[in-house]
From Swiss-Prot:
Organism: Saccharolobus islandicus (strain L.S.2.15 / Lassen #1) (Sulfolobus islandicus)
UniProtKB keywords: ATP-binding, Kinase, Nucleotide-binding, Ribosome biogenesis, rRNA processing, Transferase
Statement: the UniProt record of this protein carries the keyword Nucleotide-binding: yes
A GO molecular-function descriptor: ATP hydrolysis activity
Annotated protein name in UniProt: Putative adenylate kinase
EC number, as in UniProt: 2.7.4.3
Region (NMP): 30-53
Length: 187
């Protein structure tokens, strides 16, 4: 059994994935840690304080593990995983997510890009394109880890979630675009 838990940074992937793996007695794999530990990246992006992954190498190495394991895989890149029985996309209200990421001390550009990705549903769309009806979206806003875990275990999906129906979110997206645009010379 392969379960992918995905979503933008700050939505609760790590703790939910670990709890899910414990509840189902499956191994846990953080794809980010896997990439770093196995040097499956091409460079380090100083501006975003992130590694640029080598997608081909990641897919190749991941395939070796998937073929012999039962896993909960935590990742922001669901399409790098070749197969899954369930794909859980954790979502979070963009305003709440912004506060979460700012609280981590992240650079403004990194916060803005990740919140923009959440608003636009980038990871959700990627998951749906790769895994179609195996996707379950869960809104983690103001939920405890236990509540999130129960929703996943009971496949109580909230999605598809569309943040852009809210005019406040639309205006927020415009502000995020301004932040991102201010970094254009650095990108």
């Amino acid at each position: 059994m392969i379960i992918i838990v995905t979503g933008t940074p700050g939505v609760g992937k790590t703790i939910a994935s670990k709890k899910l793996s414990e509840a189902l007695n499956l191994n846990y794999l953080s794809l980010s840690q896997f990439v770093i530990e196995n040097k499956l990246y091409t460079e380090y992006d100083e501006l975003r304080q992130s590694y640029i992954i080598d997608e081909d190498k990641v897919k190749e190495e991941l395939e070796k593990i998937i073929s012999t394991s039962h896993l909960v895989i935590e990742t922001i890149y669901p399409s790098l995983v070749s197969t899954a029985d369930l794909v859980v996309v954790l979502r979070k209200n963009p305003f709440s997510l912004y506060n979460e990421l700012k609280g981590r001390g992240w650079a403004d550009i990194k916060v803005a890009e990740n919140v923009e990705a959440e608003i636009l549903g980038v990871i959700s769309q990627e998951a749906r394109e790769a895994f179609k009806d195996k996707v379950c979206e869960v809104d983690t806003t103001e939920m405890s880890t236990e509540q999130i875990l129960n929703k996943i275990l009971n496949k109580q999906c909230d999605g598809p979630i569309e943040w852009l129906v809210d005019t406040k979110v639309q205006r927020f997206l415009e502000e995020l675009d301004k932040i991102i645009s201010s970094y254009e010379n650095d990108i």
